[in-house]
Structure formats: C-alpha cells, structure tokens
C-alpha cells in the first residue's frame, strides 16, 4: 500500500531556510543536492512510513511522531491513517524537538 506524504507549510519553510543557508555558504549546486536528498528520503515514507525511528523526546513519541535522518538533517513526521504529515525539517545539530 502506498501512503500519501504531505509536507506541511512549516516544513516547507524549514526546507527553504536550509536551502538558502546552503546557497549562501556553498552555492546553488550544493543547495539543490541537499534539498533533493532530503526530499528523496521523505519520499520513501510513501512506501515505508514506519521506517523512521523514535525521536529523542518522550512527548513527541507519545503523540506518534517519528523522525527520519537525512544526513545532517532530520524530518519529523506523524502518520495519520494513510497520510504521512511532515511537520518540520531541521539540522540535526539543533534542538529540533523544541520546534513543537
């Protein structure tokens, strides 16, 4: 069964901020590679929504949130029925659990 992945506006904003940072620091090619990698990892959730791991935050885990690691980034998501909602995309070196 294929699930539908919906990237919420907050996650799109996060992705754009990351893209802008990589664009300034390393150029457009690197920025596009990073964004493409993050989106390809998220896309895998269409087939494997349980492939993510628990977050380091008990509250998020209690409410069914999971995360997938995209090299230096993490996507926080929750599956509700047949839809996987992406809530945030953050750098793994930040306190990303405090985004909620």
Model-predicted segments: where are they?
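Arg/Lys-rich, positively charged N-terminal/basic patches that mediate binding to nucleic acids
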Residues: 1-36
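A short, surface-exposed loop/turn module that caps and links secondary-structure elements
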Residues: 43-69
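Enriched for short, Lys/Arg-rich terminal
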Residues: 70-100
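PIN-domain endoribonuclease scaffold, especially VapC-family toxins
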Residues: 4-6, 33, 39, 62, ...
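Hydrophobic packing within well-folded, soluble alpha/beta domains
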Residues: 5-7, 38, 77, 86
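Structural signal for well-ordered, non-membrane alpha-helices
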Residues: 19, 39-46
